[in-house]
A protein has these predicted regions:
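Conserved phosphate-binding/catalytic loop of the ribokinase/pfkB sugar-kinase fold
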Residues: 77, 103, 113-155
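Short gly/ser/thr-rich secondary-structure transition/capping motifs
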Residues: 3-6, 131-136, 176-182
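Conserved beta-alpha-beta core of the PfkB/ribokinase-like small-molecule kinase fold
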Residues: 150-227, 249-251
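Conserved phosphate-binding/catalytic region of the ribokinase-like
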Residues: 2-22, 184-185, 210, 215-345
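A glycine-rich helix N-cap at a beta->alpha junction
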Residues: 90-105
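Active-site-proximal loop->helix
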Residues: 82-94, 113-115, 119, 123, ...
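Glycine-rich phosphate/adenosyl-contacting loop at the front of the ribokinase-like
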Residues: 1-75, 82-89, 93, 270-274, ...
């Protein structure tokens, strides 16, 4: 039987300065077509709006954390093209350092997205210069990695750079946060250097080798994830947290401590979802912010949900990423629902 115990700890906005974060970024020039609904295979639909903006999972997280008051260093590869020029202009506007931004020969990354009226989306990405980063680029950023209090990585950049940066972080005792998206099976060395894994409900099926998709309810998802935690721990020996985002159903978080797992569920904020593209990056940013503030897992899930909701309630991604004032306004309107600890009896 699944039961829940409420936690009513308040969520508060702290003021900067906060500790430093190192983000393994990536950059794609994103082109998004807004359509009434997503097309079927072989079908052509007319889009009613075209949106072009800089994007990328790592770039989104770097920008969001910077806006929230975190001191961010980021490793990004971009091409020697107009898109690369646009990236440098964006970083300058956001106040992000470009010490570890590398202009490489060839095109920048490009992405194409279709966004339905209900907020659903499908995305394709050409990595371009993102795949040209190497372990040497991560080594050149060693000082920034070792000075960070959290290192974030994702799979839209070169895997060898992520692996090298996580190894540096682990050797220094810096917690690592991995969003293995787009999903691919991570190498053993990367699994052995990852403290926290964040995936969505689709990626969780691959990550945990589940026999079927999660059933779409927090209770069913929690049972499936809980049953797979022993296998996850064996495959990811350094991992102490696993977070699974459930869209409109919030997020699950599991934590390994004192040789046992505990699990929490944080309900999603009720919003009118306009565009869910980038909501997961918003969640990762809010979660990372909470970790940097020293918050426990239940509060980190609440922060993640709050930032994700801010993005999903707006069109676009970069412009929809919150700052501290934006989050404070949301909290003033309606405090987030308390996370609940789940037990299986």
């Amino acid at each position: 039987m699944l039961s829940a115990r409420p936690r009513l700890d308040p969520i508060v906005v702290t003021t900067p300065p906060l500790p430093r974060a190192f983000v393994l970024g990536n950059f794609v020039q994103a082109c998004c077509w807004h359509v009434a609904r997503l097309p079927q295979a072989g079908e052509t639909l007319e889009a009613h709006h075209l949106q072009i903006e800089p994007g990328g999972k790592g770039l989104n997280v770097a920008v969001c954390l910077q806006r929230l008051g975190v001191a961010v260093d980021t490793l990004i590869g971009c091409g020697d093209d107009a898109a690369g020029d646009a990236l440098l202009a964006l970083l300058a506007r956001e106040g992000l350092a470009t010490t570890h931004v590398h202009r490489l020969t060839g095109p920048s990354g490009w992405g194409a997205g279709l966004i339905g009226a209900d907020g659903s989306n499908c995305i394709a990405v050409h990595p371009g210069a993102n795949r040209l980063l190497t372990a040497a680029h991560a080594e050149a950023a060693r000082g920034a990695i070792e000075a960070a209090r959290l290192v974030y990585g994702q799979f839209e950049t070169a895997l060898v750079a992520v692996e090298a940066a996580f190894a540096i972080a682990q050797a220094r005792g810096v917690p690592t946060l991995l969003n293995p998206s787009p999903w691919q099976a991570p190498p053993e060395a990367l699994r052995a250097a990852t403290h926290t894994v964040i995936v969505n409900e689709v990626e969780a099926v691959d990550l945990l080798a589940l026999p079927q998709p999660l059933d779409g309810t927090p209770q069913g998802a929690a049972r499936a994830v809980a049953a797979a935690l022993a296998g996850f721990h064996a495959h990811w020996p350094a991992a102490r947290r696993l977070v699974v985002t459930l869209g409109e159903h919030g997020a699950l978080g599991a934590e390994f401590d004192d040789e046992r797992w505990s699990m929490w569920h944080a309900p999603a904020r009720a919003i009118n979802a306009v565009d869910t593209l980038g909501a997961g990056d918003g969640f990762s940013s809010g979660y990372a912010l909470a970790v940097l503030q020293g918050d426990a897992l239940p509060m980190a899930l609440a922060w993640g949900n709050l930032c994700g909701a801010h993005v999903a309630a707006r069109t676009g991604v970069i412009d929809a990423l919150p700052d501290a004032q934006g989050l404070a306004a949301m909290i003033e309107q309606a405090p987030p629902a308390a996370a609940r600890q789940l037990t299986f009896e």
